[in-house]
């Protein structure tokens, strides 16, 4: 049996990879251990968040599936950091985990060019460092020249609950052990990481009256441009799967509340008294865990001065019969989990439905990858998701999409899609991984991006949909609508930049009615709109041309006006960076004479002999600081 592309693993990375490949015309096979669990949310019942919301909207802009599914499975929608600037705001949705999984599985089953097989991949087949196929536990051999591995925590997964250990990829699911050995046999550098999850509790046993209420936003904002622009069309396709649309096809989800409680000194004492039974401290766990999502025992150990920690109580489904306790990830023994949980306000009589646990798993050092997510050593082998050292559904989905796109582009003999750091958070994510590597689970933050004002959630669709359209994942009619809206926004911005208001009596009265500050000299409308007291809806009162602008378009215009000069500064920085990267490296340059470069970087530059600074920047381990040093030296060298 032969396929153009084979994907191993049906999690968030695998879904995006196989959908992108199949939709781009490649005959695709998804091999997954348990078909019913395609799209399962292994940990928290939420999509998005700070920087993660950016990733979801970028995935959507490129033609991925995560945003659409989130809109139809969402049961609470919130914008985080709303009081801060638009660059760091993040969209987050609680999801019905069952609805999300069922929706994703149905999408895959109804996608042309895509087959699904429930098997365990055991061996990667190669010939002369070229992928030739994959073998499964059933003895089946599937031939392909392009293989995408998206195994998540299943790669040699080992679960810990106290001193108890269990080989598994998730509770109740087989791990992928032989595949890990097959990767090692290919000579790939590998390591061991760890993550964890919290107890899930029966809603009937929670005292909600003792908890703080956390509602969603009054107005829910969808993740996908398809939900915003083409809701009627999508609602017809998914009418039996989602209740998030009203009778007119408008996005109007019923939002279910979350709750907040806190640990206390008694909780901490119980956990401290059982440190000697915690696999995290006894040496039982060897993998490195996520710095920014530590277990409760790790938090109490590292932050001994804290007298309490937040616990976010989140429904797992629309029925809200079971709750996820965000903040209580643990690998402590079951009896200790019960004891410390009963010390938390509102959970004195709580019954655990599913215990918390830690899981260790193998990963491949991401410096083994090209920016296309193809491995350097094996042609046609792509890796995406937690196997590359990341943590999070959104980070995984972003990598899966890029791997699927690039495998399909390779079939078409086209150059891979490589997003720059100034173009997308996806570009930042992949560049960080392949150039710097990681020794701990990597998660995305807005602080990782140098050009945050250019990479906002609200402009993701305008930044990246051109790529999605070019490769065939964004349909013509979708791109036409996106282009129309982009042109409409630019038209509005140009009007505000080019039209001046004079400080006469009539205009001053108009400014007062708009709540804007008075002016004493001729001023562009852009500066007026960019004032701190101006709101998006007031733009409609400036000129009749704005009457038909949508709320989203006005909001985008407001942001561009408020941060206009800072945005221009970042655009200038990007232009300078592009010019710098185009700088040619003289062939006679002796890298060993450049002070400030490490021996490792000098060795790599000598090995690959890059013709330009851009080519040098693509070499794994060559840092931005090294590129700056090279640039300065080249200018001095040419001036001699």
UniProtKB/Swiss-Prot annotation:
GO molecular function, one term: flavin adenine dinucleotide binding
Gene Ontology biological process terms in this record: tRNA methylation; tRNA wobble uridine modification
Main location: cytoplasm
Pfam family, one: SAM_GIDA_C
InterPro entries assigned: FAD/NAD-bd_sf, GIDA_C_N, MnmG, MnmG-rel, MnmG-rel_CS, MnmG_C, MnmG_C_subdom, MnmG_C_subdom_sf
Cofactor: FAD
Top-rank taxon, per record: Bacteria
Keywords, sorted A to Z: Cytoplasm, FAD, Flavoprotein, NAD, tRNA processing
Subcellular location: Cytoplasm
Residues that coordinate or bind FAD: 9-14
One GO cellular component term: cytosol
UniProt binding sites for NAD(+): 289-303
Similarity section: Belongs to the MnmG family.
PANTHER family registered for this protein in UniProt: GLUCOSE INHIBITED DIVISION PROTEIN A (PTHR11806), PROTEIN MTO1 HOMOLOG, MITOCHONDRIAL (PTHR11806:SF0)
Subunit structure: Homodimer. Heterotetramer of two MnmE and two MnmG subunits.
Known function: NAD-binding protein involved in the addition of a carboxymethylaminomethyl (cmnm) group at the wobble position (U34) of certain tRNAs, forming tRNA-cmnm(5)s(2)U34.
Protein name in UniProt: tRNA uridine 5-carboxymethylaminomethyl modification enzyme MnmG
Gene symbol of the encoding locus: mnmG
């Amino acid at each position: 049996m032969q396929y153009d592309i084979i994907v191993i693993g049906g999690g968030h990375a695998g879904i995006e990879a196989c959908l992108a490949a199949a939709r781009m015309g490649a005959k695709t096979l998804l091999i997954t251990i348990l078909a019913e669990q395609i799209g399962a949310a292994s940990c928290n019942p939420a999509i998005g968040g700070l920087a993660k919301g950016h990733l979801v909207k970028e995935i959507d802009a490129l033609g991925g599936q995560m945003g659409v599914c989130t809109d139809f499975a969402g049961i609470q929608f919130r914008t985080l950091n709303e009081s801060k600037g638009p660059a760091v705001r993040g969209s987050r949705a609680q999801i019905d985990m069952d609805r999300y999984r069922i929706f994703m599985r149905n999408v895959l089953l109804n996608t042309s060019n895509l087959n699904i097989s429930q098997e365990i991949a055991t061996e990667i087949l190669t010939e002369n460092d070229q992928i030739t196929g994959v073998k499964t536990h059933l003895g089946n051999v599937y031939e392909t020249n392009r293989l995408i591995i998206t195994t998540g925590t299943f790669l040699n997964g080992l679960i810990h609950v106290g001193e108890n250990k269990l080989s598994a990829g998730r509770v109740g699911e087989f791990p992928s052990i032989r595949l890990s050995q097959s990767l090692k046999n290919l000579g790939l550098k590998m390591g061991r990481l760890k993550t964890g999850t919290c107890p899930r509790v029966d809603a009937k046993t929670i005292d909600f009256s003792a908890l703080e209420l956390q509602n969603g936003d009054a107005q829910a904002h969808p993740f996908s441009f398809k939900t915003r622009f083409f809701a009627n069309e999508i609602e017809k396709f998914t009418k039996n799967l989602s209740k998030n649309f009203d009778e007119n096809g408008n996005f109007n989800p019923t939002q279910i509340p979350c709750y907040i409680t806190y640990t206390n000194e008694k909780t901490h004492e119980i956990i401290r008294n059982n440190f000697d039974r915690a696999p995290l401290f006894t040496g039982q766990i060897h993998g490195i865990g996520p710095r920014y999502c530590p277990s409760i025992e790790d938090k109490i150990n590292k932050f001994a001065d804290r007298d309490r920690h937040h616990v976010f109580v989140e429904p797992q489904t629309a029925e809200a019969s079971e709750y996820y306790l965000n903040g209580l990830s643990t690998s402590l023994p079951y009896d200790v989990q019960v004891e410390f949980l009963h010390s938390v306000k509102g959970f004195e009589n709580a019954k655990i439905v599913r215990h918390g646990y830690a899981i260790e798993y193998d990963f491949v050092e991401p410096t083994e990858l090209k920016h296309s997510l193809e491995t350097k050593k094996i042609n046609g082998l792509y890796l995406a998701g937690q196997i590359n050292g990341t943590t999070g559904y959104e980070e995984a989905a972003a990598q899966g999409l890029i791997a699927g796109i690039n495998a399909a582009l390779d079939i078409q003999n086209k150059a891979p899609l490589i997003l720059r750091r100034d173009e997308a958070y996806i570009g930042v994510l992949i560049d960080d991984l392949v150039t710097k590597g990681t020794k701990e689970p990597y998660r995305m933050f807005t602080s990782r991006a140098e050009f945050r004002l250019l990479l906002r959630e609200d402009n993701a669709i305008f930044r990246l949909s051109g790529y999605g359209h070019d490769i065939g994942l964004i349909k013509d009619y979708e791109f036409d609508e996106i282009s129309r809206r982009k042109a409409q926004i630019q038209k509005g911005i140009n009007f505000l930049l080019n039209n001046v208001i004079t400080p006469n009596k009539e205009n001053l009265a108009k400014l007062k009615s708009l709540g804007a500050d008075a002016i004493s000299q001729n001023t562009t409308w852009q500066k007026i709109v960019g004032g701190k007291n101006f709101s998006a809806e007031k733009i409609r009162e400036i000129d009749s041309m704005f009457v038909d602008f949508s709320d989203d378009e006005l909001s985008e215009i407001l942001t561009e006006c408020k941060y206009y000069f800072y945005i221009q500064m970042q655009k200038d920085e990007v232009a300078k960076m592009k010019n710098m990267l185009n700088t040619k490296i003289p062939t006679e340059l002796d890298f060993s004479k450049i002070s400030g470069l490490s021996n490792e970087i000098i060795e790599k530059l000598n090995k690959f002999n890059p013709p330009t600074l851009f080519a040098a920047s693509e070499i794994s381990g060559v840092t931005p600081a090294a590129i700056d040093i090279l640039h300065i030296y080249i200018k001095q060298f040419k001036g001699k």
